[in-house]
C-alpha cells in the first residue's frame, strides 16, 4: 500500500533533512510504501539542491520545483497532481504536524473514511493573536459560506485516491484549499492531536499572507459580501426617506429652519465612504473573475525529477 506525503517547502533548507530522516526512521510507517512529494515553491536558499540530492538516492521521493513563488495553495495542488499513492496526506515540513499522527489517519481511512481530518486540540505553540484571529475567521467563514470548514483543521489530513481525483478536476485558479477539500465531500472522520513546535527555522507565513488567504477563503465560497450591500443600500435609502420626511414636517409644522451645509456635507461624505467600501468589495470579486477568465495555469514547473518541464 502506497501513502503519499505532499510537502510544500519555501526556504526550508534547515528543516527538510530533519523531516526526511524522521519519516524514514519512523517504525510505524515502515509497513507502507511512503512516497514523499516535495514542492519547492521558488525558494532562494539551498532547498532545491537538498531535495534533488535526497531524490537521487531515494526513488520514492518526487522533487518538484516552481519557476517562481506561486504560493502554498498552488504548491499543494501541484503535490496532489503528482502524488501516486492510494491515499495522500498534505503535511508541513516543520513537523509541527507530528509524524506520529499519520498511522492514526491511515487507521481511520482503512476503516472506511474518504477523508480523515487532523484537528488541533492544542494550539499553544501559536501566538495568542494568531489563535484569536483564526477563531474569528472560522466563525465568520462558517456563518456566511458554504460548505463549512472544520475549526482548527489545517491542510494536514488524509484523502483517499477518489477524493484526490475529484479535487484534480476543479479548474479554478484562485485556490483556497481548505474550502476545496471540504467542498468535495465524502465520508469524513477526525483525529485530534496537539501541535508541536517547529523543529528548525521560522515560519514563512506572515500576517499579510494570512489576511490574503482569509479574503480568498471568503470570496471563493460566499457571495454574502456582495449581497449585504443590497441590504445596506435599502437601509440607507429608508433612513434618507425618513430624514427627508422629518425635515419637511419640521419646517411646515414647527417652522424650524432646516440645517443646510453641515447636514449635506455629512450625508455626502457618509454615502461616499459607503460607496467606496462597496466598490472595493465588488472589485475583489471582479478581480477574481478576471484572473479566472485568463485561464493561466495554477503553477509552472521548472523541474519534475531532473527534467525541465512547463
Curated annotation (Swiss-Prot):
Keyword Cytoplasm attached: no
Extent of the signal sequence: none
Sorted UniProt keywords: Glycosyltransferase, Host membrane, Membrane, Transferase, Transmembrane, Transmembrane helix
Organism superkingdom: Viruses
One Pfam assignment: Glycos_transf_2
Enzyme Commission no: 2.4.1.-
GO CC terms: host cell membrane; plasma membrane
Record membrane topology: Multi-pass membrane protein
Transmembrane parts of this sequence: 229-249, 263-283
Primary location: host cell
PANTHER family, per database record: PROPHAGE BACTOPRENOL GLUCOSYL TRANSFERASE HOMOLOG, UNDECAPRENYL-PHOSPHATE 4-DEOXY-4-FORMAMIDO-L-ARABINOSE TRANSFERASE-RELATED
UniProt similarity note: Belongs to the glycosyltransferase 2 family. GtrB subfamily.
Purpose of the protein: Involved in O antigen modification. Catalyzes the transfer of the glucose residue from UDP-glucose to a lipid carrier.
Name of this chain's protein: Bactoprenol glucosyl transferase
Designated gene of the protein: gtrB
Amino acid at each position: 500500500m502506497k501513502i503519499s506525503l505532499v510537502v510544500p517547502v519555501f526556504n526550508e533548507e534547515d528543516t527538510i533533512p530533519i523531516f526526511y530522516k524522521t519519516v524514514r526512521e519512523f517504525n510505524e510507517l515502515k509497513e507502507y510504501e511512503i512516497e514523499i512529494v516535495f514542492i519547492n515553491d521558488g525558494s532562494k536558499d539551498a532547498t532545491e539542491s537538498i531535495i534533488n540530492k535526497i531524490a537521487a538516492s531515494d526513488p520514492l521521493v518526487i522533487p518538484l520545483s516552481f519557476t517562481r513563488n506561486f504560493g502554498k495553495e498552488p504548491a499543494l495542488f501541484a503535490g496532489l497532481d503528482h502524488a501516486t499513492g492510494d491515499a495522500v496526506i498534505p503535511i508541513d515540513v516543520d513537523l509541527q504536524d507530528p509524524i506520529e499522527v499519520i498511522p492514526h489517519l491511515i487507521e481511520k481511512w482503512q476503516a472506511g473514511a474518504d477523508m480523515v481530518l487532523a484537528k488541533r486540540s492544542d494550539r499553544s505553540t501559536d501566538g495568542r493573536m494568531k489563535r484569536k484571529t483564526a477563531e474569528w475567521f472560522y466563525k465568520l467563514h462558517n456563518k456566511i459560506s458554504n460548505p463549512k470548514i472544520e475549526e482548527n483543521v489545517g491542510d494536514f489530513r488524509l484523502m483517499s485516491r477518489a477524493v484526490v481525483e475529484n479535487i484534480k478536476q476543479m479548474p479554478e485558479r484562485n485556490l483556497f484549499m481548505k474550502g476545496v477539500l471540504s467542498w468535495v465531500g465524502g465520508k469524513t472522520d477526525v483525529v485530534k492531536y496537539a501541535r508541536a513546535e517547529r523543529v528548525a527555522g521560522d515560519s514563512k507565513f506572515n500576517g499579510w499572507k494570512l489576511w490574503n488567504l482569509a479574503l480568498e477563503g471568503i470570496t471563493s465560497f460566499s457571495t454574502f459580501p456582495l449581497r449585504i450591500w443590497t441590504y445596506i443600500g435599502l437601509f440607507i435609502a429608508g433612513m434618507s426617506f425618513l430624514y427627508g420626511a422629518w425635515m419637511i414636517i419640521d419646517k411646515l409644522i414647527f417652522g424650524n429652519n432646516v440645517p443646510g451645509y453641515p447636514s449635506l456635507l455629512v450625508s455626502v461624505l457618509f454615502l461616499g465612504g459607503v460607496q467606496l467600501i462597496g466598490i472595493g468589495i465588488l472589485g475583489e470579486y471582479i478581480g477574481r473573475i478576471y484572473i479566472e477568465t485568463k485561464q493561466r495555469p495554477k503553477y509552472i514547473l521548472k523541474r519534475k525529477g531532473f527534467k525541465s518541464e512547463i
